[in-house]
Design a protein with these regions (language model features):
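ATP-dependent carboxylate-amine ligase
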Residues: 1-144
């Protein structure tokens, strides 16, 4: 927890269904800033639109297929007032997510995509996310 914001690694959320479940589970109690994107595996991302618009405060998009995810959810999510941000790295994604989150929110990295465009595997993506959160904690003077 950093400044009353929790950070959740769901790097195993490599498909739309898993991410929808994570959004519904964690979003029931608080608003989320969700990090989405990666290697999309030709999935239909449109089922993300409704739960993202319901549970998210903001979305940060990473990876090769970020534009595809954005295109699939933009109309519904944009209409609900949830902003969409692009990030070139996991560190940038975590930094943007931290800026968008408010006290009591959570940052959820549940990408709905495979990791192979930017990382060796989902474990490597999780490691890089955790390192980015630790760097953020260090920069804000918080011990994790």
């Amino acid at each position: 927890m950093i400044r009353d914001i929790e950070y959740f690694d769901d790097s195993k959320g490599t498909n739309v269904g898993a991410t929808v479940a994570a959004l519904a589970g964690l979003g029931a109690d608080r608003k989320l800033v969700v990090i989405l994107g990666g290697e999309g595996k030709s999935q239909d991302f449109s089922p993300l639109a409704e739960p993202v618009s319901r549970y998210a405060r903001a979305v940060v998009l990473i990876g090769r297929d970020a534009a595809l995810v954005k295109a699939a959810i933009k109309a519904v999510v944009g209409a609900s007032g949830v902003p969409l941000f692009d990030a070139g790295s996991m560190q940038e994604a975590v930094d943007i997510a931290a800026q968008q989150a408010r006290t009591g929110d959570a940052v959820l990295m549940s990408p709905a995509c495979a990791s192979f465009d930017m990382f060796d595997n989902y474990e490597h993506r999780a490691q890089v996310f955790c390192e980015a959160v630790q760097a953020l904690a260090h920069d804000t003077g918080v011990l994790v």
